[in-house]
A protein has these predicted regions:
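Alpha-helical scaffold domains
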Residues: 1-235
């Protein structure tokens, strides 16, 4: 059944009636966003997105509004379920301006299975996005890299992109550190050599080593090497 403005309005009213005040308060502490928060958990929103995607996905997206944080999250999850590349890219590009927090950014990218299936396309897309002056658009690019492109020939291409990226955004810096910590797991030697070249800010290097040392997939010897590297480079 197609979505209409009235059906959508009634649907959102029902969602709002299911909001959890305590979960809303928790979300407000960990997500900084301009959108009012209802207090709905991610597993519930994912189930709703699946239902919508089986129903009439495009008519839903024609009605969707951005009045609450959960509506934006739900839109991201529905877009992530699109399987046709051209259709996906159309909605993806239009959605980027709505992203104002790490949770929506990471949800969109991590839920979009099409990005792994069309890896070349989205690696190119990521290279474009990281040039954006909008921090959460740039973060989308780096999260695409770490979620879908830590494989094959892509990592070697990432290092100069990281070096040339210029921003003091906390959320982009954290995404870069996250990316490098993931690269250390599967491409330890190459990534360690890159870290030793000392192109990174003190903040990103510290966060990279911290995240890497939290991983159970690196050996004690590797973690000791990274800690020593950090100590040597940060004066």
């Amino acid at each position: 059944m197609s979505w209409t403005a009235e059906r959508y309005q009634n649907y959102i009213a029902e969602l709002k009636s299911q909001g959890d005040a305590k979960y809303r308060e928790f979300t407000e502490k960990v997500v900084s966003t301009k959108y009012p928060i209802i207090g709905l958990r991610m597993p519930f929103l994912k189930k709703e997105a699946k239902k919508i995607s089986r129903d009439d996905l495009e008519s839903f997206l024609s009605c969707v509004r951005s009045d609450t944080y959960e509506e934006v999250l739900l839109e991201a999850l529905v877009i992530a379920n699109i399987t046709d590349l051209d259709t996906y890219l159309s909605y993806f590009d239009s959605f980027l301006d709505k992203i104002d927090n790490w949770a929506v950014c990471d949800t969109l990218v991590s839920s979009s299975k099409i990005m792994s299936k069309e890896r070349n396309c989205f690696f190119r897309k990521g290279r474009i996005l990281i040039r954006s002056k909008e921090p959460f658009v740039a973060r989308v690019g780096f999260v695409i890299f770490l979620t879908h492109c830590v494989t094959g020939h892509y990592p070697k291409q990432m290092f100069p992109l990281i070096t040339h990226y210029q921003s003091d955004s906390y959320y982009v810096g954290m995404a870069i550190a996250w990316l490098l910590s993931v690269l250390l797991i599967d491409f330890y030697d190459e990534t360690k050599v890159y870290l030793e070249e000392n192109h990174l800010s003190k903040f990103i290097l510290q966060k990279t080593v911290s995240k890497a040392c939290d991983s159970y997939r690196l050996s004690k010897e590797q973690k000791d090497e990274l800690r020593a590297l950090k100590k040597r480079l940060i004066h």
